[in-house]
Regions:
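N-terminal helix-loop segment corresponding to the beta1-alpha1 unit
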Residues: 1-120
Length: 120
């Protein structure tokens, strides 16, 4: 069991976690832990060519998982309706820290922000 995971990272340097410490054999320990077994591609989805490349990749995947604020994927031409028109059996999971609707839905959220809001 398992999945072939392609992680899309922002150019030019990819995931900022790659440069975090501590280092293990010159690689960031947290990056190794969180991305073990994943393939990574740097694609700028803010460009037409980047969005086009993502739409081409959809033909080769079963699931798209995204964690942008609600509406970002639609605004980039990469929403569920667009991707499902390309590959009708695509599964898409949209994960956001404050949900898809509500007063805080448009706010970005990461682990430390969620911990602060919940009192951890």
């Amino acid at each position: 069991m398992g999945a072939n995971v392609i992680k899309i990272e922002q150019p030019p340097y990819g995931d900022p976690n790659r440069s975090s410490r501590p280092r293990i054999n010159r690689r960031a320990g947290a990056h190794i832990q969180q991305n073990r077994g994943k393939q990574s591609l740097c694609i700028d989805i803010n460009t037409d060519s980047g969005s086009k490349l993502i739409r081409e990749l959809v033909n080769h995947v079963d699931v798209v998982v995204e964690n942008f604020s609600p509406g970002v994927m639609n605004n980039k031409g990469l929403g569920y309706e667009t991707l499902a028109a390309i590959k009708p059996d695509i599964i898409m999971a949209s994960i956001s820290g404050f949900g898809q609707i509500g007063t805080l839905a448009s706010q970005p959220c990461f682990d430390l922000v969620a911990q602060g809001y919940t009192g951890l």
